[in-house]
Structures are given as C-alpha cells and as structure tokens.
C-alpha cells in the first residue's frame, strides 16, 4: 500500500484567536495571586534569573504607564488649548463691550 492510498486524517479547524476585548477581560478578571502575575523566588538557583525577569516586568509596566500618562497629557494639552482659545476670544469680546460702554457713556 502506498502513502497515497492511505486515508488522510482531517484535522479540525483551528479556533479563532480571542479578540482584544476577550484578552483584556481575562487579564482584568485575574486575581492578584494568579501565578502568571507573580514572581516565585522559592528556587535559590534561579533567584537572579527571576529577579531579572521581575525587574523587566516592572520596567515593562512602568513603560506602559508612561505611555498611558503621556497620551492623557497630550489629550489634556489639546483640551487646554481649546479652552484657552475660548477664554481669549471671550476676553477680547469683553474688552470690546467695555470699550463700547465707555463710548456710550461719554
């Protein structure tokens, strides 16, 4: 019997990967003591390796927080510029109204 004559096994299709929302829901739903989110220092031989991994993890989260804060600051800057423009135009209108009142009283 040749290999072509053998019946091919049909494998099931691969499931779709989870959506970003599903991943975020899983991460946010995880408890703090989840083994994925903690560093285990019980093995002394891998202590330095784990410490390095924990430090990298800490730096990663600090970087993520920095990026988030930077994005929030950019949004705040845009909002403040818009409010500044509104206040500037209101101040100019107020000065015009004051000048008109001065002229009207004279």
UniProtKB/Swiss-Prot annotation:
<dbReference type="InterPro" id="IPR028227">
    <property type="entry name" value="UPF0449"/>
</dbReference>
<comment type="similarity">
    <text>Belongs to the UPF0449 family.</text>
</comment>
<protein>
    <recommendedName>
        <fullName>UPF0449 protein C19orf25 homolog</fullName>
    </recommendedName>
</protein>
<dbReference type="Pfam" id="PF15136">
    <property type="entry name" value="UPF0449"/>
</dbReference>
